[in-house]
Every structure is written in structure tokens, then in C-alpha cells.
């Protein structure tokens, strides 16, 4: 069980990091970060296509020998822990801040403050962020949302906003390389850059 939790969390860290750094994965994940509030409802604001994009990452578990039932159970428990991180009610948790992704660490992850962008990708263990240099402590007041906040509460518009941006970039791209980067480049990337 312990090895299953650690492995799931390690894979989740990389899946989540890619979801912030690869355009088409950001298009899937962006609506979760578009809320300018932080509460438990944000945990429910999940990507419509998220389960599909997780398959290539998490199919590794049974392929390398982990029991699928134990993997699924550990995944559910890990997800429930992630839900608890979406709150402002719980402040800092002392020594647990060094081991677990606490609500404080996850608030940082949802911040659009410059010092908080692309930080704290872990779900259960904060150690991956510490090891891979993506950790940040909650120091300043967190400004929630994305850099260019959406100006709507319409879930369909929020879900497809970045897909439309990618399509427009694709239409304007001059080279094959730029057309490919429209989907696999960094979210802030634009053609001819």
C-alpha cells in the first residue's frame, strides 16, 4: 500500500506538472484554476477531459506490476486528500508542511501571484516539489485564478477558452514546427516566438 501511494503520487506530480506546462494538457486543466475563489467547490471544478488525459500516465501502474484494485483504491484515497486542500479555513499545519501537500501548499498552487506560478504540483506528498525545485511556501496573500482571468461564469466557455486560443494560434502558425508547438508547447507560447 505504501509503495502504491508513493508511486501514484510521483506519477501524479509529473502528470500535474505537465498539465501546467504543455498547452493541450493546460487546455484540459485550466478550468480548475480559473476560479478566483478558493473553497471546496473548486475541487469539483474538474476538467471534462481530465480522466482521458490521465490514462497514459496512470496505466503505468498495472503495467509495472501494481495490483489494479489496490491502485484504484489508493487513487481514490489520494484524490479525497486533494479535495481537502481546497480551503482557506485551515491555516498552516506545523511539521506536516514538510511532508504533505497541505491546504497552505495547495493555496500557493492555485495562486496567480508571480512567485506562486508553477509551484506545488504534488497531491499527497510535498517532497516531489522540494526535490524537483517547484516548492514555494505561502508567504504573501494568494491571488486566485489564472494570469488572464476568464470574464465569464459559463462553464462551456471556460472549458473551451484555451482550446479556441490554441486553434487560433494553429491557424496563424506559419511552420510545421509552430503548428505542432500550438499543442505541445508551453501554455504562454505563441507562434513565431
Regions found by a protein language model. Give the residues of each.
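Cytosolic-facing loops and C-terminal tails of multi-pass membrane proteins
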Residues: 141-193
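Membrane-embedded catalytic scaffold of the fatty acid hydroxylase/desaturase
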Residues: 1-144
Amino acid at each position: 500500500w505504501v509503495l502504491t501511494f508513493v508511486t501514484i503520487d510521483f506519477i501524479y506530480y509529473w502528470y500535474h506538472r505537465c498539465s501546467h506546462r504543455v498547452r493541450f494538457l493546460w487546455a484540459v486543466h485550466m478550468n480548475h484554476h480559473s476560479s478566483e475563489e478558493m473553497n471546496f467547490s473548486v475541487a469539483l471544478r474538474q476538467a471534462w477531459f481530465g480522466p482521458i488525459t490521465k490514462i497514459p500516465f496512470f496505466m503505468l501502474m498495472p503495467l509495472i506490476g501494481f495490483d489494479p484494485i489496490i491502485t484504484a483504491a489508493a487513487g481514490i484515497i489520494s484524490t479525497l486528500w486533494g479535495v481537502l486542500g481546497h480551503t482557506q479555513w485551515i491555516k498552516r499545519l506545523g511539521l506536516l508542511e514538510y511532508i504533505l501537500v497541505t491546504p497552505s501548499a495547495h493555496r500557493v498552487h492555485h495562486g496567480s501571484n508571480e512567485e506562486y506560478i508553477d509551484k506545488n504540483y504534488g497531491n499527497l506528498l510535498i517532497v516531489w516539489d522540494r526535490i524537483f525545485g517547484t516548492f514555494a511556501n505561502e508567504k504573501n496573500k494568494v491571488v486566485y485564478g489564472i494570469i488572464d482571468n476568464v470574464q465569464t461564469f459559463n462553464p462551456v466557455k471556460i472549458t473551451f477558452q484555451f482550446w479556441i486560443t490554441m486553434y487560433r494560434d494553429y491557424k496563424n502558425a506559419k511552420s510545421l514546427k509552430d503548428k505542432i508547438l500550438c499543442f505541445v508547447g508551453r501554455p504562454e507560447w505563441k507562434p513565431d516566438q
